[in-house]
Amino acid sequence: MRLATAANEAYTAPLAVSELLGCKQCGGGRDHDEELGIRIPRPLGQGPSRFIPEKEILQVGSEDAQMHALFADSFAALGRLDNITLVMVFHPQYLESFLKTQHYLLQMDGPLPLHYRHYIGIMAAARHQCSYLVNLHVNDFLHVGGDPKWLNGLENAPQKLQNLGELNKVLAHRPWLITKEHIEGLLKAEEHSWSLAELVHAVVLLTHYHSLASFTFGCGISPEIHCDGGHTFRPPSVSNYCICDITNGNHSVDEMPVNSAENVSVSDSFFEVEALMEKMRQLQECRDEEEASQEEMASRFEIEKRESMFVFSSDDDEVTPARDVSRHFEDTSYGYKDFSRHGMHVPTFRVQDYCWEDHGYSLVNRLYPDVGQLIDEKFHIAYNLTYNTMAMHKDVDTSMLRRAIWNYIHCMFGIRYDDYDYGEINQLLDRSFKVYIKTVVCTPEKVTKRMYESFWRQFKHSEKVHVNLLLIEARMQAELLYALRAITRYMT
């Protein structure tokens, strides 16, 4: 448990202890410090997300008793409530599983020492230029006794961690290229070799933070107050709210419209939702009437896989990584490339041959006990999570839509389900949504607020956060499948 030992350390947490216990006004003792001449940082920006109005997050967080308990547990474990946690407030069942899994990976007994875990988190987040996560884990790395020299660049870290850089690179951007030779190179590196258990722990951490970078960018997570870009020393503007309002129930605010795009007319919103629901009804009727042959199903997968290569955004420009992030990884020019372009041919990964439930789960649990179960629970919650709503409609079965989103992501990675009709994807996911999905999953550093607002314009922010949970868990599972299959092939 991390406890603040000095006044200035208390301010490094986005939510200080006094705030957690229910301060009624911003300050928590800060006014007294300002009288003493101490410069106190104030949040820069409007709430935990640049995409989601702060008032919506405040209202949800203050009305749910379960969230209060989760916040308290998270604060006790990490000494902070970060903005990712605050945005996940919309989905408490998932958040509980997420926090439990992350706590186990970072703090409970395991093959890797604590400072290695945070450094691997830094390496993984840096591949997507996610300074938000890098900054969080730099602080945690130092807190658990990590050597500050390692933070000057990957070349200053132990050779064992440097050797992990290649796997990190390929796993983050082109996981279909991972082979058993990558695994062998790490396990047989003489005095710098990894054990199988250590490697599985590292792989889980890498996939966790690659995916969390996707969530960070996909939801427009704002920098923490103690990080670069997250604070100012200027006097506050007139406002009645601070982050502590989440825990003390002080939310006497005007109701925010549930429509995430204010410029969309009510009639446009209505017809977009109705059109999507009608497509779902038609597809269900087609399922009941006829079933496509295996050959036709395979053909539709190949068509969707090829089409996914040509889904890109108009903002698809290269993003040059900043030095403070790029020093944590090598080969800065290496990034996502569609797996079938440039004459490359990669065999389709058939889930019937190697899947998480029958193969990956047991391998992880054998080498890193209990983690497989935690990850499996998180996958299932994200995949099955539903409130049976779509925008303004209730009592809607959204399973078809959730499956289309999950399988589209796996399709982009070359992963095929023999029992799924990939023709449904084009019926349910329009181009703007596909652009958002592909950007969040493959090049999250390029996500813009315009992309977030352009898909499902009539849906609530909570529903868009739900989409992001599906995206990150599907991505994590895809990466794990390729990495764990390579480990299995090495072992056999």
Curated annotation (Swiss-Prot):
UniProt keyword annotations, A-Z: Cytoplasm, Nucleus, Oxidoreductase, Phosphoprotein
Reactions mediated catalytically: a hydroperoxide + L-cysteinyl-[protein] = S-hydroxy-L-cysteinyl-[protein] + an alcohol
InterPro entries (alphabetical): AhpD-like, Sestrin
Phosphoserine: residues carrying this PTM: S293, S314
Subcellular location: Nucleus; Cytoplasm
Top enzyme category: oxidoreductase
Binding locations of L-leucine: T386, Y387, N388, T389, T398, E463
Top-level taxonomic group: Eukaryota
Pfam families: PA26
Active site, renumbered: C130
Chain residue ranges for the region called C-terminal domain: 321-492
GO molecular function terms attached to this record: L-leucine binding; oxidoreductase activity, acting on peroxide as acceptor
Family per record: Belongs to the sestrin family.
Function: Functions as an intracellular leucine sensor that negatively regulates the TORC1 signaling pathway through the GATOR complex. In absence of leucine, binds the GATOR subcomplex GATOR2 and prevents TORC1 signaling. Binding of leucine to SESN2 disrupts its interaction with GATOR2 thereby activating the TORC1 signaling pathway. This stress-inducible metabolic regulator may also play a role in protection against oxidative and genotoxic stresses.
Domain remarks in the Swiss-Prot or TrEMBL record: The N-terminal domain may have an alkylhydroperoxide reductase activity. The C-terminal domain mediates interaction with GATOR2 through which it regulates TORC1 signaling.
Subunit structure: Interacts with the GATOR2 complex which is composed of MIOS, SEC13, SEH1L, WDR24 and WDR59; the interaction is negatively regulated by leucine. Interacts with RRAGA, RRAGB, RRAGC and RRAGD; may function as a guanine nucleotide dissociation inhibitor for RRAGs and regulate them. Interacts with KEAP1, RBX1 and SQSTM1; in the SQSTM1-dependent autophagic degradation of KEAP1. May interact with PRDX1.
Protein name: Sestrin-1
